[in-house]
């Protein structure tokens, strides 16, 4: 065998050329104990709070506790194979998630990894999960409406862009339905929607995605799911992942909406982590910083000033109450952080009043300044009328002979309750809401309400047929309201004439 010196020297030269002087330094510790997805690690003296760690099998972990002789970390993934004594590496990274237009129409997990079987996201940008909320100077007061398509909300508890409006109520009272209707109503409004499902059944999330697809809403929506079977750290992180993705649109001068469904499950996941990390428990066994958990999340919803691009992020957090108890720890915390709340009541729901909004307790602290003038004109007295009706209805149970004025008020109240009823996944444009509420609250030439002669059980049919009639015979009225956003004398005159005409052709059944 011939040894060729030039060949050998060429190979040696190539190897020298490829030789790198770079030395990789990795700080590695070992697991002292691991239970229920929380590990205690010895030997990571340089670890920072919120840093990502690498466990065996490529599983990531998040540093939550820094103690004198060890580090407490939450394992974000399956932890059954992780044993005592296993090595754990520091990554030096803070948790980041993909952001951008590429996420629209996708379903991702609590860390932004796609779970819809449609391949990688190919997102061009990444953002840190934990960033500070915009300061006072960067903000502007809420002044633009964010329509939900639900008469009871847009008329009585209006929501503005950049607002945080809490939706709370017992289980199965229609909280998610209100949120989904809001997404459906904003089709074509250049509003990017993010739905964060925390601790939900996977079948429930699949149903929500299916509904959004059916109505063509998935093209401007991203679903972030940390389901009931996911580890507690994923359920704790999912809302922050969602808000980080939504902030990308807010900071680029666009408008976004985020729905957290629901934050009580995030608080439960955080309580679980805190107790396993042996942090001292407080009221209802929640840790002392559970308020900060939600406040730092909800403060990231904001209406930015013109100098910052005038973008907005509206938040609709959902909280589940137990037996209507609004004074429990988590509900009171979130009520104090948000700009108002919509309270859904199981009693109303079972009576067939849907959406089951308790108008008395529900408020919107800043939405009034975002409501369009036309809605203010027609719905000004609606809340008071409904409150009077509820009060009288409670007294009327005890009295048999009621005077005529009381009977009139009760009959009118019953019709107003019917007027505010609405089917699921059937949001109405604001001009159509204004027309229906005008018919319910304004008076005809004789000084009576337009729907005074309509039997209570036929009000819903009257309202549906009224819109069909106006679409067919007087389409200009709705267009004029949409353009002017106010009811001037000309529109009122046309609307009164149309209502008079409709009264002549509407047939009362039975």
Swiss-Prot record:
Disulfide topology: none
Topological relation to the membrane, as annotated: Peripheral membrane protein
A GO term for molecular function: ATP binding
An annotated GO cellular component: plasma membrane
A Pfam family per the record: ATP-synt_ab
PROSITE patterns: ATPASE_ALPHA_BETA (PS00152)
Keyword field: ATP synthesis, ATP-binding, Cell inner membrane, Cell membrane, CF(1), Hydrogen ion transport, Ion transport, Membrane, Nucleotide-binding, Translocase, Transport
Entry keyword annotation includes Ion transport: yes
Primary localisation category: membrane
Reactions catalysed, as given in the entry: ATP + H2O + 4 H(+)(in) = ADP + phosphate + 5 H(+)(out)
Lineage top rank: taxon: Bacteria
EC supergroup of this enzyme: translocase
Biological role stated in the UniProt entry: Produces ATP from ADP in the presence of a proton gradient across the membrane. The alpha chain is a regulatory subunit.
Family label: Belongs to the ATPase alpha/beta chains family.
Residues at which ATP binds: 169-176
Location in the cell: Cell inner membrane
Name the UniProt record assigns to this protein: ATP synthase subunit alpha
Entry-linked SUPFAM superfamilies: C-terminal domain of alpha and beta subunits of F1 ATP synthase, N-terminal domain of alpha and beta subunits of F1 ATP synthase, P-loop containing nucleoside triphosphate hydrolases
Site (Required for activity): 362
EC number, UniProt record: 7.1.2.2
